Amino acid sequence: MSTVESREVRPARERWEVALPDGRVVPWTGFQVGPAGIAPHELAHICRRLLGLGPAEAEAAAREELSPAGAARDRPGIVAYSPPMAKRMFEGALESLAAGEPAEDWPTILEARSVCLAHEGDLLIGRTAPWKEAAAGRPVVEVPDHDHFHLSHALLRLADGPADRWSRVLGPAIDRLRADPACVVRVYALDEPMRILLLWLKRVAGVDRLLVEANAPEITEKWGHKAVLHPAARAAHDLPAPPGRAPFDVLDAETELTPLYRVFGLAVPRLPGYTVVWDGEPADAVTDGGIRTTPGDPVRVPVTPGDEPLGNGRARRAEDSFAAQLVLAAQLLRGRHGVRLGCLKPVRGGTGQRIHVGVPLDDPDVLAALARQAARSGEDYLLEAHADYLRHAVTGHEFLLAPSVHVRAGALADGMALQFLNGTMWEGNVFLDESTHAAFGIARSHYARIRHAMADFVRLFEGRGLINGGVDFAIARVGGRYDDTTLVAMQDLNLSACGADYLHAFLEESRTVLGALAGTGTGISAATKVIRPASDMDLPRLRRLVDHRTPTSYARALTSVPGNWGLIAVACPDAVRAAEEVLALEARLTA
């Protein structure tokens, strides 16, 4: 089981500590919430107590009673953003602490920045100080639980407690649903804890169906990850590939083995790559049977990758299989595609963590070490050809041409977003469209191909519960048998709420604020940028330094989690100017 799922809960004290397998005890620092979680067996008990249903029955009920829907601006809804289980944000936090590195406080970040997406009159649910600052002056529900990493777990604990307590805290949300059964609840992702919570909330409110701005669970869980773009290494190995066959013919043949093609007949542009499947159960990757999250009785964290052997024979067999598949994937990339370097990444990672670039595919020692490390997480991985992205520089930044295209309220969003990247980590976006993509070095043919591929993808899932999300693309070379050919390829499916949502929301706001300019026919572009605010840089202070408006530009501080994470934005008529101004603003703030 995943680390977040295997945690036990105890009453909170003043601080938490994490006991690492090597004997070190480190403080759970840099977070405004604790590391507590709900174990799977207890989640099942809570599900039965709240709903009278087992987990499988609750999943079936959610398909009937929770309806994916886009939120309308003229109808106040409810906003409750919790870290999605599939993104493994808790696991990423543990890895950072184990390595002695600062960790991003994703629960607080998601709560605080969700306010940027709120419509007029939306009821906001959260618990942290940055969220309260962002939500000032808006209707709110403040959750009195800072122990649990996931807001959804904190809310389930509340719901499973005394009725007089949950009715007092959640009364405004229940009253809103009763007053307007068509009210839309907006969540980051409709994962299992959130499904159970919303089914319970629906029953308490007495409404027939609950509208939820999130993808249907099958969309996010079955199709919202990298593995759907690539064949499994073992399946690809069985594909005849005669020597001398043209590389693009090989790539096309392998594309027919991908889940998207096998189920829907959709061939998407992709880089050479293969999935490496974890054959064991997720629990086989965890040496310790449980993780304690009691303050003063330190949290037990799974073994640092590669430090200790796995704890049972089944796990050892799964690890051996994983390592063999990784070697096979490397051999296929070298033999069929002539590629010498690879990129190893978890198929469900969503924050740019745990990605290894420039992997030498002919080095067995490196492959073995990476296999041991990756296998510890008990999840599937992807070994893809290393992408040498085309690049374009503006003042203050060199962009990798790795644009993303998005779905909003079930429809293909305008344009595309070019990403600010720090290594493999997302740090903001610039909005590009037909009139501005060339200024960032994106050829018209590449822009058109990306938009066409995304339109096909959205059309495929029309009516299946696709409400929001984004797809990351690469405009890159991989070398080998492809020589200097530039490939345009889908690389990642983020079928849930995502960072570019804030770019699109700010762009809509900017078009209203700069309405006189837009009325002249002048286009408006925008850029968002992640910053690292000082420990005393709360949102009111950041706004005093950032917010300004002129007839041709608009800047605003969107989020601040002091000492951890912030988001600023700039809008103006020119995309390059928007990017350069947001970078200059970041530089002034951090000088």
Show which residues each predicted segment covers.
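A long amphipathic alpha-helix within ATP-dependent nucleotide-binding catalytic cores
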Residues: 376-401, 426-485, 524-548
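Peripheral (often C-terminal) accessory segments that flank ATP-dependent C-N-forming ligase machineries
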Residues: 8-15, 512-591
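A short beta-strand motif that forms the metal-chelation/ATP-contact edge
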Residues: 405, 482-495
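Conserved N-proximal alpha/beta basic substrate-recognition cap immediately N-terminal to
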Residues: 109-113, 125-321
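Intrinsically disordered, low-structural-confidence terminal and linker regions
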Residues: 1-68
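Glycine-rich phosphate/pyrophosphate-binding beta-alpha loops
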Residues: 421-426, 491-504
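Histidine-anchored nucleotide/phosphate-binding helix
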Residues: 100-119, 124-125
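Conserved ATP-binding module of the ATP-grasp superfamily
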Residues: 267-271, 299-343, 360-395
